[in-house]
């Protein structure tokens, strides 16, 4: 136990100025291999993780995703890694995640895991779906080399900053013809369809439709002095 008065008082300290640490995109060979793999993909999926957020790299991720025209899913607890307003966004994987995201990544032949450790909460089965694409080629990008290939078998590992890596890959793919270019519209329609189906299912979860619940809601609404809606 520490006496409370020990936590009070004044001391002389020097607060250091913040420094900016240069973070690179990863090795040239790894970037070239990743670009080749993405160029050959028929149904690529981009998995955006916490590294995108911490690296302030959402804009770079959007640019890369739009070049690929691919579905984008969020890693567990990192819904802010890609904007939900974007048509290619599909929602989070894993625990209490989006069925649309899981169904789409299950179809992937190449997954670009950008700034994510691929932890178990975002890769294990959910909604009775074992959705992780066992046969897909995985490109994992993480600033910590110890995370590369730790959880999932990968084809290419890139130790680099998520934003710098996304920018480098976009530059490598900018003038190339991609295998998935021919199916861009078809894949966009598939993405939109899966999202619409998931939204419809969520609507059924949101509103009570059974007779008992409807009667209880009506009874509560009509109760005098009850100002709180039953659903709240």
Q: What are these model-derived regions, one by one?
A:
Residues 26, 33-111, 230-232:
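Anionic-ligand anchoring segments at beta-strand to alpha-helix junctions in alpha/beta enzyme folds, i.e.
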Residues 1, 69-76, 139-142:
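Short internal beta-strands
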Residues 189-232:
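Active-site diphosphate/adenylate-binding microenvironment
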Residues 1-7, 50-52, 145:
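Glycine-rich beta-alpha junction loops
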Residues 14-16, 56-69, 126-131, 156-157, ...:
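Short, solvent-exposed amphipathic alpha-helical segments in soluble enzyme
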Residues 18-32, 214-217:
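An N-terminal, well-structured beta->alpha segment
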Residues 78-197, 201:
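Glycine-rich, acidic loop regions that bind phosphate or pyrophosphate groups
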Residues 4-26, 180-187, 198, 205-206:
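Aromatic-enriched
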């Amino acid at each position: 136990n520490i006496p409370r008065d020990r936590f009070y008082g004044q001391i002389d300290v020097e607060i250091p100025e913040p420094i900016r640490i240069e973070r690179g995109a990863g090795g040239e060979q790894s970037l070239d291999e990743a670009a080749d793999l993405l160029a050959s993909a028929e149904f690529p999926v981009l998995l955006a993780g916490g590294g995108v957020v911490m690296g302030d790299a959402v804009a770079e991720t959007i640019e890369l995703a739009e070049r690929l025209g691919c579905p984008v899913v969020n890693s567990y607890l990192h819904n802010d890694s890609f904007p939900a307003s974007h048509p290619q966004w599909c929602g989070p994987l894993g625990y209490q995640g989006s069925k649309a995201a899981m169904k789409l990544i299950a179809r992937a032949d190449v997954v670009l895991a950008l700034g994510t450790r691929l932890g178990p909460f975002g890769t294990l089965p959910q909604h009775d779906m074992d959705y992780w694409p066992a046969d897909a080629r995985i490109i994992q990008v993480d600033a910590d080399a110890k995370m590369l290939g730790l959880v999932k078998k990968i084809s290419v590992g890139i130790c680099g900053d998520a934003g710098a890596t996304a920018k480098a890959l976009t530059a490598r793919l900018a003038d190339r013809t991609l295998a998935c270019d021919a199916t861009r519209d078809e894949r966009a329609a598939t993405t939109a369809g899966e999202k619409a189906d998931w939204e419809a299912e969520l609507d059924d979860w949101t509103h009570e439709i059974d007779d008992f619940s409807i009667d209880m809601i009506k009874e509560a609404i009509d109760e005098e002095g009850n100002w709180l809606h039953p659903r709240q």
